[in-house]
Amino acid sequence: MEMRADLLIVGAGMVGSALALALQDSGLEVLLLDGSPMSVKPFDGAAPFEPRVSALSAASQRILERLGVWDGIANRRSSPYTDMHVWDGSGTGQIHFSAASVHADVLGHIVENRVVQDALLDRLHDCDLGMLANARLEQMRRSGDDWLLTLADGRTLRAPLVIAADGANSAVRRLTGIATREWDYMHHAIVTSVRSSKPHQMTAWQRFTDNGPLAFLPLERDGQQDWCSIVWSTTPSEAERLMALDDEAFCRELERAFEGRLGTVLSADPRLCVPLRQRHAKRYVAEGLALIGDAAHTIHPLAGQGVNLGFLDAAVLAEVLLQAAERGERLADVKVLSRYERRRMPHNLALMAAMEGFERLFQADPLPVRWLRNAGLKLVEKMPEAKALFVREALGLTGDLPALAKA
């Protein structure tokens, strides 16, 4: 049997789910499909932290509030942070960013991805939106003015407009032949949660080591500030060595690499190790097709901005589609969809380039580069206006914001 919709969203992760919610009152027949069961786990506040977290910006918080999702996150578990401290492990340069410098309450919230996902799914289940679970895409081709999708179980779906929100290894992007520019950082990231003897002080800490950045991101449980999510970017060989250590030895290595800023590392949860690659689609749209989130771009986890870019993608695309619908335009028209690409691609590319340059700068080892790097950090630390600009960018409140992200 063939199913039909006005718009198919492939991928019910955080970004795809947000887009579906943003379109819930559009009058369009929206169908959200995913290869997972799309079920919500009962939340256990005493359970260990999930290893994968996101640093949600103020813009993302506004979007999630307006979609009716933020309370579901706050009622589970989220950790606000007010400050960020960055320093160069090869010198004396350091810089401190504060929410107070721009009269904000917080810089953002560290939230487990599973918490965000479950809050979104809870909201989706409360809405009158079509959802198709355990739906794995196998084939996709043009059929007249529509896309015809075939699932692994043989079912077929038809729609004039398909949104790819199916992640970094997007099947939609592959099946429709959209090329990407991608490169391997030759680094792996070790992620886990650790408990320290000193409180994190609602501060995100980041040290640049000779092998890559090491971040301690604050987590909070029952008002206690002694847990952090860590993201340790290093060479593949060093990552392999660190992953082979027992928990006690790993904690001691982590403590040394972090210069004991948070005292003794008391314990560590199970570790994950993931290779770091950056991808960017050469185009975000085609006739009847748009890419959002990691399907369009993946960036270095250095700034924790990946999902924030994705939420802005979803909010802008929803805005473009709703405005086009009001004008009576054909939503699948590539000219309509290109409005989304024009608004999002330059911003995403600029942030990706900045993160790439920052990462390369701190990996450069020659003495003159290290001297300039430290001098630059010290200089910016003495320039409150420059630091405030960085903070506003981190809050996600600059550039061409969609209505969902505006105050």
Positions of predicted regions on the chain:
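N-terminal Rossmann-like FAD-binding beta1-loop-alpha1 element of flavoenzymes
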Residues: 5-32
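Conserved N-terminal helical subregion
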Residues: 2-3, 73-175, 183-188
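Conserved Rossmann-like nucleotide-cofactor binding loop
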Residues: 15, 38, 169
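N-terminal FAD cofactor-binding segment of flavoenzymes
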Residues: 48-89
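FAD/FMN-dependent oxidoreductases across multiple families
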Residues: 238-332
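Conserved FAD-binding catalytic core of PHBH/FMO-like flavoproteins
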Residues: 64, 146-148, 162-264, 268-271
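C-terminal helical "tail/cap" subdomain of flavin- and related membrane-associated enzymes
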Residues: 319-407
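Glycine-rich FAD pyrophosphate-binding loop
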Residues: 24-50
